[in-house]
Structures are given as C-alpha cells and as structure tokens.
C-alpha cells in the first residue's frame, strides 16, 4: 500500500500499513499488520489470526462501519459469530436529507410481488437479471439488475441514471 499524499512534494510515494487491533474488555488480545488500504478486507484474516493464536472461537465480533461488507457479514453468519457491524452507508441513510432525495434509487418504492421499483416519475423499473462478480479476495457477490423500459424523453433521466 502507498500513502495517498506526497508530504515532501518530491514525487516519492511512502509505504503505508494498515494496523488492526483486537480487544476484549479493554485489553489487547491480538494485532496484525496488513498492506490493504481499507479495513474491509482485513476483517476476516485478522479475526482468524487472533482466534488461531488464542486457540478459541469467538461468539461475538463488534466492529465499526469500515468493516461492513457482504463478504464479512456472510463470514460471520457461516461461522456462527454474532456480529455487530454497521454497514458502510448506515450513517448517511439515517439522515433526513438522504431520505428526501427522491432520485436516489434506495428511496424508490419497491413492489416485491411484481419485483420492480417505481421511479419518481411513476415509471416501472422491472427486474432484468442477476449478475455475479468475483471481488479481489475471490468472494462471489450477486447483484440484481433493474432497468426502466420508458426513459426516452424523460426530463429527469439524468437525475436517475
């Protein structure tokens, strides 16, 4: 990993490391050093390393939103670990300003029976397909794709797409 800023302004990028520390009752029970620039991909290896070193299996894991990802939630569930981990957009989503953004697709009305959203202009946005992608760590993520059939000539098209 490299630092994002060149503090010396000489064109040399400095190496950076991501330190993870696990605690229980305010005592450090383990730490790891990673080259990953984000916390998301350090969660599972750090948890496994600490459990291995301590020779135990955790029942609970608490982490901040930076660790929230589908892969991490899936890992916790499969390993029967109760996780208290906010998802990354939680703080943004609870704000009134976020909920007032009518063209944000997360605020659109969803009809589970029809499996379609309704855009702010009243047009149906039906389910089209499911796409599976492999992330850098090899985890398969599944996405549902929805597509409006009647966007031609809509004056708000740029706000939706």
Across the structure, where does each feature detected by a protein language model lie?
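Anion-binding and metal-coordination hotspots
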Residues: 1-161
């Amino acid at each position: 990993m490299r630092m994002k800023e060149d503090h010396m302004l000489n064109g040399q990028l400095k190496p950076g490391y991501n330190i993870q520390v696990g605690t229980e009752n305010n005592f450090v029970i383990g730490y790891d050093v990673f080259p990953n620039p984000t916390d998301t991909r350090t969660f599972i290896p750090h948890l496994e390393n600490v459990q291995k070193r301590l020779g135990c299996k955790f029942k609970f894991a608490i982490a901040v939103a930076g660790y929230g990802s589908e892969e991490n939630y899936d890992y916790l569930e499969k390993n029967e670990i109760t996780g208290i981990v906010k998802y990354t957009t939680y703080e943004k989503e609870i704000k009134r300003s976020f909920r007032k953004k009518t063209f944000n697709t997360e605020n659109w009305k969803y009809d589970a029976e029809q499996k379609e959203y309704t855009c702010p202009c009243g047009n149906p946005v039906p389910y089209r397909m499911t796409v599976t992608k492999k992330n850098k760590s090899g985890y398969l993520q599944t996405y549902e794709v929805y597509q409006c059939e009647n966007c031609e000539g809509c004056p708000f098209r740029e706000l939706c797409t």
